[in-house]
């Protein structure tokens, strides 16, 4: 079994995927507009350029998306970037935070040399731990977060 991710955008799917392709090293393998589908009978003229389906591969992850009328930013899920260096974490944090909303600025934590949480300008929520975190049995671990200002802790 393989689990892929499907994101809904409110008219900016193409811009988001092109941005991710350029800055996250992804490769767009499919992008179709509503105007390119075979039967366009029910497609409003102002929606023909909207993305019906897009697919991008980022590393070993497949991310799919579409423009959906009335789509809202992600609120209860985060895409997580596991990066190889603090420098790469800082670079991508700056790019994804530009025009977005920062929930937790990039900083050192008890579990990572760099960690951040944000929503980019396209409405996608991201977490940035540079490397997979390691926890000792006695240290607290962040279990869940929603809304962003309320943390729930446990131990591992």
For each feature predicted by the language model, list its residue ranges:
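Core segments of cupin and vicinal oxygen chelate
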Residues: 7-60, 142-156
């Amino acid at each position: 079994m393989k689990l892929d991710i499907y994101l809904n955008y409110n008219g900016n799917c193409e811009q988001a995927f092109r941005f991710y392709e350029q800055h996250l090293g992804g490769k767009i393998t499919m992008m179709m507009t509503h105007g390119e589908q075979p039967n366009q009978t029910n497609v409003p003229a102002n929606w023909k350029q909207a993305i019906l389906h897009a697919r991008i591969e980022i590393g070993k992850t497949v991310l799919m998306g579409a423009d959906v009328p009335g789509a809202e930013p992600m609120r209860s899920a985060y895409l997580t970037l596991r990066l190889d260096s603090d420098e790469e974490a800082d670079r991508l944090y700056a790019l994804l935070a530009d025009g977005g909303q920062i929930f937790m600025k990039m900083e050192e934590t008890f579990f990572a040399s760099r960690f951040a949480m944000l929503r980019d300008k396209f409405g996608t929520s991201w977490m940035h731990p540079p490397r997979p975190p390691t926890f000792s049995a006695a240290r607290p671990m962040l279990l869940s977060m929603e809304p962003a200002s309320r943390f729930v802790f446990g131990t591992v």
